[in-house]
Amino acid sequence: MPMITPDEIDFEKYERETDAKRKVKPASQWVQELIDRIKNPTYQPRSVMPWRKTHKLIQFRPGEVTVWGGANGNGKSLVTGQVALSMCGQDEKVCIASFEMKPSKTLERMARQWSTYNVSDPAFQGDERATAQFLDLYEQFRDWTDNKLWLYDQQGTVTASQVCAVVRYCAKEKGITQFFVDSLMKCVA
């Protein structure tokens, strides 16, 4: 699976791009888009969460930000991992920046969610047939995630400008459409 490591990329290039230069534009620039939407309504595909009862309530549109909040240890990483897998299944390209867990730990959890099996379950320990099935499942998972799922390999604190640079890099260079930051508390000034 492709990894994004901080040492391989000139993130300073992306940090030098100022928001003011790229983002401040006259409001009139968007009026024609509003007119076109009224004249020619189109369906915009949107990603949904993996739970059917949420499909009409919550959708993820391109260019928008979603913040997942909750107390420490309440399962935000677990839920967002499941949502990330669902988005991969909807042909989104996803990158996860987990500053609290190593990529292998994040991926181990996601592999359990994807396969619905826990390789650490004592019921499977010592069973050669189960081990062979797990190895096969992990190989399938590896192949399934290829060109769908990336992990940013950075633990500990990181600056907000570095996170923005990584997001821009992922969008421009990798075509990433969904970026998960876990956790914002690790982003410092």
Task: Locate predicted features.
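Accessory, often N-terminal, substrate/partner-engagement and coupling regions
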Residues: 1-17
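Helical hairpin unit composed of two closely spaced alpha helices linked by a short loop
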Residues: 177-189
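Cytosolic-facing regulatory segments adjacent to core modules
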Residues: 55-56, 89-175
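Generic detection of intrinsically disordered/low-complexity segments and helix-coil linkers/edges
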Residues: 5-8, 24, 45, 128
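Structural motif
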Residues: 67, 151, 177-180
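Short glycine-centered, acidic/aromatic-flanked micro-motifs in structured strand/loop junctions
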Residues: 70, 153, 183
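The Walker A/P-loop phosphate-binding site
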Residues: 14-117
